[in-house]
Amino acid sequence: MLPLNLDSLFTPLAFAFLIMGDGSWDKSGSRIILHLNNFTLIEVNRIQSILLSKFDISSYLVKTPHSDKDRGYILKIPARNVSKVRELISDHIYPTLKYKIGL
């Protein structure tokens, strides 16, 4: 369950922790993927909305096959937004995890 004040808590540092924990780099599409499989659609939509409103980072949702009907979503940040993500959070990412943002 996400806190009601998530938008005020969702800082570049918090975003970096989300990527370090649940993120991956898709080489074929040069995009960042957030594996939010245990979040509900409402929660994932909230995260997506915060990324857009606070950081101007667009994304799109994909339902994973064979997942629970209420959960099992991934959020994909397309290549056109990767440079924004890197600029925003690269200082907060552990060096050994920078591969998750394609660095």
Task: List PLM regions with ranges.
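Internal intein/HINT superfamily modules and their associated LAGLIDADG
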Residues: M1-L103
